[in-house]
Amino acid sequence: MSFVRRAALAAGLLWALCAQAQPVLNLYSARHYQTDEALYANFTKATGIRIQRVDADDAGILARLKAEGSASPADVILLVDAARLWKAETEGLFQPFKSATLQKRIPAHLRGKDDGQGSQWFGFSTRARVVVYNKTAVQPGDVDSYEKLADARNKGKLCTRSGSHPYNLSLFGAVTEHLGPQKAEAWMQGLVNNMARAPKGGDTDQIKAVASGECGIGITNTYYLARLMRSKSVDDQAVMEKIGVVFPNQNSWGTHINIAGGAIAKHAKNVEAAQQFLEYLASDAAQAYFANGNNEWPAVSGLDFSNPALEKLGKFKSETIPVSVVGMNQVKVQQMLDRVGYR
């Protein structure tokens, strides 16, 4: 065997041994954003911990965790809805842990309840659920609260995605917490009465339908707006010129927000590395990245970031009820939706 060949084999063996020696964090993520790649790469660069990732939607991740049971390799779980995080906690898929860093940096209403052993999940970024309106068909004062969306003046103007989609279930869960079940159900009936068409599509579809005049009013998460605002597409820019944006309930409880959050899996094998990763997500660098890279607001307050779309949307008053209540209210909300015929 030649010297060159022996050297190459030795180098390959050394690389393989080093790769095996490098600590690995198994991440199950429902965040399907290519921009998150840099977030993970920066963590590995800073810590030497390699991330092995499984991507699926939230429901798929929860189903997989249940099927795998104690044999699951998952260390960290990332989900994109507070109700789903709450549901996973109630089903025993997470474990509590104490972190002075996360307790200090993540506001209490954006994390799971601490029963004395620590919270089981933490929110790391937020998105607001806002109202968009056609500037030629609707006045902003007619949609400056969620309650007004159900007013008779808005009959035939409203477009939404399915009422049973998690984004809407969470909004309706929050409204139920604020108004109480009886008034909330009457409000949902008002939404159904005001539909311009049957619920369909995603949030971007609602924005475009409002711009086209098919609808006068729509409901969307803010990061969908920010994507269109930052787009170089002439068509996307034309859409944004035709719509206005309202952050509802600025004179009362504030605009509804939801979170993307993380937890340590119940049967995690690398708990220390998992906690290190979650604490990294609360760092200034990672928090700014959520804003700059994916158009989400940081969960940590007072941080500087550079996102022209979020800056243009401006500051707003957000609700401060514990985000976990949207999960607690989800069953009753779905029952209300069924009764009023909101599909």
Where are these regions (language model features)?
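Extracellular/periplasmic bilobal clamshell ligand-binding domains
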Residues: S306-R343
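Ligand-binding pocket segment of bilobal, Venus flytrap-like solute-binding proteins
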Residues: G163, Y167-S170, A174-P248
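A structural signal for short loop-to-beta-strand junctions that line the ligand-binding cleft
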Residues: S72-I77, Q95-V131, E147, L158-C159
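Ligand-binding clamshell of periplasmic/extracellular solute-binding protein-like
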Residues: D55-R64, S72-Q95, T101-I106, T126, ...
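Short beta-strand->loop
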Residues: Y28-R31, Q117-W121, Y133-T136, G141, ...
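Early extracytoplasmic/lumenal segment of secretory-pathway proteins
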Residues: Q22-K87, R343
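Periplasmic solute-binding protein
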Residues: L85-L93, G116-D144, F172-G173, I257-G262
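Mature extracytoplasmic/periplasmic domains
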Residues: A260-T320
